[in-house]
């Protein structure tokens, strides 16, 4: 069972009290992956929200019919970080692929069905989690915008 001490530090669960965390804990399962192993693929219908327990996860943009490359890595996630938010937001399709980026990765998978069921029976928990999730997605979007601006600026400078 995933310790409550860890769950309370997870970015998406930080606002939850012990009772709410205990309920979330029942939906969690620890799984392991090896370096380079795919956790999920772009376009798949998500069944889980994921949390990094140990190791690193690389989120990569994949072109259809091509293998993942380091250059297509959008983000590296470390312990306590959440990914797979598409499991909670329509149209419920993963936007990126996820790979284990270290020798081994230990992850927590949180059942989407159980989590959405919890949100229906306990709207306060749902509100707290979705508010945190929105903040996380927003911050990642801003980070991506900054990276695109840097690259475009560099391209413009190189054309002079």
Task: Give names to the regions the model predicted.
Residues 1-30, 34-35:
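Cyclic nucleotide-binding regulatory module and flanking cytosolic helices
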Residues 28, 46-47:
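Short loop/turn microsegments at loop-to-beta-strand junctions
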């Amino acid at each position: 069972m995933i310790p409550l001490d860890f769950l309370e530090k997870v970015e998406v669960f930080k606002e939850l009290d012990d009772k709410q965390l205990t309920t979330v804990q029942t939906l969690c399962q620890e799984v392991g992956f090896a370096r380079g192993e795919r956790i999920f693929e772009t376009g798949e219908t998500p069944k889980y929200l994921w949390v990094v327990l140990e190791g690193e996860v690389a989120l990569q943009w994949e072109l259809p019919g091509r293998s993942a490359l380091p250059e297509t890595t959008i983000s590296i996630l470390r312990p306590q970080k959440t990914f797979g938010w598409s499991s909670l937001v329509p149209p419920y399709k993963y936007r990126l692929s996820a790979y284990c980026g270290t020798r081994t990765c230990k992850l927590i998978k949180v059942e989407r069905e159980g989590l959405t069921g919890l949100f229906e029976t306990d709207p306060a928990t749902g509100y707290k989690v979705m508010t945190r999730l929105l903040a996380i997605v927003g911050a990642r979007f801003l980070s991506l915008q900054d990276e695109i601006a840097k690259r475009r600026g560099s391209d413009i400078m190189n054309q002079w």
